[in-house]
Amino acid sequence: MAMQMQLEASADTSVEEESFGPQPISRLEQCGINANDVKKLEEAGYHTVEAVAYAPKKELINIKGISEAKADKILTEAAKLVPMGFTTATEFHQRRSEIIQITTGSKELDKLLQGGIETGSITEMFGEFRTGKTQICHTLAVTCQLPIDRGGGEGKAMYIDTEGTFRPERLLAVAERYGLSGSDVLDNVAYARGFNTDHQTQLLYQASAMMVESRYALLIVDSATALYRTDYSGRGELSARQMHLARFLRMLLRLADEFGVAVVITNQVVAQVDGAAMFAADPKKPIGGNIIAHASTTRLYLRKGRGETRICKIYDSPCLPEAEAMFAINADGVGDAKD
């Protein structure tokens, strides 16, 4: 009940957030853009002014019924509503200090991440099976609904599952641990099963439309790369696979920028079978190559420890030092490892 009130309260403040949050595409009508053209943009998957402002011109021209002259006018008007120029590092630092971090459920893991999973960026977790990737995702889907002072994001969660490993029972166990109503927690998680790489991408267009309607704090894709391994096979299709994957990750980054959600993706590993593997301490590497490496802001490498313990290592981050932390997978989600 309390959670529903919080989410309603956040809806009441949406008027104040108008200048900060994403602006609905209908704002362009007030700037002299034809209502029919706005409708065409919406049908093409552009639901906010930001989405239009960040789009390259050739993407808009590809929309049926949008000429080059119209695309120029739309981009000019969108740029007036969205600040896209230079800013001082002081202002940017101020904005960074307001970023919310979502607790992982483990104090040690939060300490390693300097607060938790960062909103407005992509966090990638990779590791072999049974290393806790999906369990962290399930825990985050609940903790993102907590109030900000309890390490939450005061928003709903969106879960795209490509491997069929989503289990609502796990969410109920985590909800009980935090003293939240199980039915409210499940109501605040939007779930979709991805069946192929094109469908996976299509779901992001739906996600964008839903994020305009309601406040979401977290978007999970578990796993972002599993379907690419089966839909594309062999070296002949490698270039097509990487281009499709790059487009998918670009859309995720755009959602993180536009709506300020925390995007968490899981990735699988591949064993290196070349000569270099003989000299490497750990011959496993994440799949997806450089494209996924550049798209992710923070990369976490998970591996098994003793018993129920798992080890998380910061593999790549623009601001976190390379370090490790231990955590455990318990009946009520991710927690601290017992000594």
UniProtKB/Swiss-Prot annotation:
A motif (Nuclear export signal) lies at residues 245-260. There is a cross-link at residues 58, 64 (Glycyl lysine isopeptide (Lys-Gly) (interchain with G-Cter in ubiquitin)). Its main location: nucleus. Expressed in the testes (at protein level). Expressed in the brain (at protein level). Expressed in the thymus, spleen, ovary and small intestine. The modification Phosphotyrosine is found at residue 54. Ubiquitinated by the SCF(FBH1) E3 ubiquitin ligase complex, regulating RAD51 subcellular location and preventing its association with DNA. Ubiquitinated by RFWD3 in response to DNA damage: ubiquitination leads to degradation by the proteasome, promoting homologous recombination. GO terms for molecular function: ATP binding; ATP hydrolysis activity; ATP-dependent DNA damage sensor activity; chromatin binding; DNA polymerase binding; DNA strand exchange activity; double-stranded DNA binding; identical protein binding. Residues 184-257 are annotated as: Interaction with PALB2. The modification Phosphoserine is found at residue 14. The keyword Ubl conjugation applies. The modification Phosphothreonine is found at residues 13, 309. One of its GO terms (biological process) is regulation of DNA damage checkpoint. ATP binds at residues 127-134. It comes from the Eukaryota. The modification N-acetylalanine is found at residue 2. Pfam families: HHH_5, Rad51. The keyword Translocase does not apply. Residues 48-77 form the HhH domain. GO terms for cellular component: centrosome; chromatin; chromosome; chromosome, telomeric region; condensed chromosome; condensed nuclear chromosome; cytoplasm; cytosol. Forms linear homooligomers, giving rise to a RAD51 nucleoprotein filament, which is essential for strand-pairing reactions during DNA recombination. Interacts with BRCA1 and either directly or indirectly with p53. Interacts with XRCC3, RAD54L and RAD54B. Interacts with the BCDX2 subcomplex RAD51C:RAD51B. Component of the homologous recombination repair (HR) complex composed of ERCC5/XPG, BRCA2, PALB2, DSS1 and RAD51. Interacts directly with PALB2 which may serve as a scaffold for a HR complex containing PALB2, BRCA2, RAD51C, RAD51 and XRCC3. Interacts with RAD51AP1 and RAD51AP2. Belongs to the RecA family. RAD51 subfamily. Plays an important role in homologous strand exchange, a key step in DNA repair through homologous recombination (HR). Binds to single-stranded DNA in an ATP-dependent manner to form nucleoprotein filaments which are essential for the homology search and strand exchange. Catalyzes the recognition of homology and strand exchange between homologous DNA partners to form a joint molecule between a processed DNA break and the repair template. Recruited to resolve stalled replication forks during replication stress. The nucleus of a mouse embryonic stem (ES) cells contains on average 4.7 x 10(5) molecules. This is DNA repair protein RAD51 homolog 1. It comes from Mus musculus (Mouse).
